[in-house]
């Protein structure tokens, strides 16, 4: 399935071993991992963080959900699947596939509203999927920067995305430190201002200027500079420790490579997207770039977009401070390497604490193939 700007291999839980160790061993072999050559030639993966992903669908007995799913980020060069976070892009593909497989009921015509349970994070998500003649509509005119072809729009609502976390991590607060802005000492950078946020996925936000960057960089500007990538990883790893996700920076870099993400932001500027299309500062509220598993993402992760929408609405956050004046945070557009993306968040204060009611965005998804996959285990 393609979901948003990512691709992954989807399974139904009853088709997989129930033992987690056996399940993960099979999934890694299907994807072609671990591969010391970094290519996943002998599997279904495509050797990037955006394409080395698996999703497992399962029926649910929860009264507030129609389908449950788990997301796994499959390491390319090491024998590991990280089940600690979510992929907001592949979330888009869960509902249409569940409908097509008969796992959930949907109207023959109109909009199917599918309530999803994200089992990694313990969060509810609602997808709105267009139906026609009893089938999911995939063709359409919705354009998503980072995806070449237009498709049908799928609107997503992430309900109360702030806080939460893996079962073995406990319930992590939306602002783990209790502050909108934190000061951390990073070797090679000195004292830097960060916003540490748990919404969508745990994310560390930093101003591009603090890194000596403009915020308009493309993949070739970042991923070809190992010394810069090491500096970015140092910021992310220190943020992971401050958020309580890792016990040390070494632990963060070795065992927590997927979350937290690192996102750097800058005021709106003109730039050229990766497809050569100009993006004008007048069309966006700010610029954002996100690091995914050690590399600059080609567009924007779905969960990164959620975190950005929430951070933008938090007064005084790193993201909020680069917004254009009078930006409406319930619907804003930001720039990323492949173009632009519209997101929005609805926040409120209760007893002096910020809470997120929902974050919304639109993506698209398409079934690329369905059938048997073979693996030698």
What are these regions (language model features)?
Residues 1-377:
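A glycine-rich beta-to-alpha transition motif near the start of alpha/beta enzyme domains, typified by
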